[in-house]
Amino acid sequence: MRGSTIAIMGALLLTSALGAARPDWRWPALPHGIAAPDLPAGTSMSAAKVALGRRLFYDPILSQNGSMACADCHVQALGFSDGQPTHVGVTGEMGVRNVPGLANVAWRSGLTWTEAGLTTLEAQAMVPMTGVKPVEMGMAGDDADLARRLSADACYRRLFMQAFPGATDGPTYARVTAAIGAFQRTMISFGSPYDRGAMPPLARKGAAQFAASGCASCHSGADFTDGQVHYVGTAAPREADSSLYGGKPPPPGFEPPPEQFRTPSLRNVAVTGPWLHDGKSPSIESAIRRHAAVQLVNVDMPALLAFLDSLTDREFLTNRTFGPPPATCPAAI
């Protein structure tokens, strides 16, 4: 447990030492009005860091028994969700929250359903790796073992040197999470029919209803989320979200706020089911009616669903740059 705490502190506090990679990164062309995402203090982007993060994201080496990778919970074809109500960890313990998609996470500072302080991708990545409530990847206290595993791999030795030139102490949690965070920031999705102005008439009608019925008061902005935590009247959580305390058990007497959850993005929402914080809504319509039945009593549901489907970016779901890395180790980047 102590090792896990030290690791989380490292991910939060040592990012100022991680910004020395080559300044060779260029963001892709973004839609009009969308600025490049701000980077947390001390972080940077580079092609080498992204390549390392991509390989780590798809490698079960980051889990206790080598059975779970980040990509097992975040599946590209499903908008980087997993198609399950909640995910089972390496010890068989069931998760408590539905896995969210990852489209455009570079622009977000609220990264979990209820988090109270995990505002960077680097800090958030520590929760699935080292969290104990629930156990996901099961690496709590295994700092030295993680470094040993990665250092024993010739490809990782080379990729870490390229991503963090000048570093002499090998792989650390801080560098692992910096690389994964860099890769996740490349997961940009602005190619849906909605973005391209290619919505069919039924979807356009649904968009008007979406705005008129008040949905856009919370599902606002380019990613259809205000990033805030709201009372939505779905179901009170039975236990604290692990992200509230970095995956550690909550303090004695802690009671989670009833029924308050962060507004999820609606990007690619049609493929990220089952829906809501607990994954207990098997369809988008059931999720809508579960938390907004009164507001939408007169809505044309087929039109609203057509609009939500128009937020699906098919290119994002198949873009090979977000998929598994080549089996062979890449040459110099």
Functional labels for PLM-detected ranges:
Residues 1-4:
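Positively charged n-region of N-terminal signal peptides that target proteins for export
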Residues 7-16:
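Bacterial N-terminal signal peptides
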Residues 18-20:
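Sec/Tat signal peptide C-region and signal peptidase I cleavage site
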Residues 22-127, 193-290, 296-297, 317-333:
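Short glycine/threonine-rich turn/loop motifs
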Residues 107-109, 136-141, 252-254, 300-304:
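Low-complexity, flexible helical/coil segments
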Residues 132-139, 149:
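A gly/proline- and charged-residue-enriched helix-loop-helix capping module
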Residues 143-190, 280-333:
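C-terminal capping alpha-helices of c-type cytochrome domains
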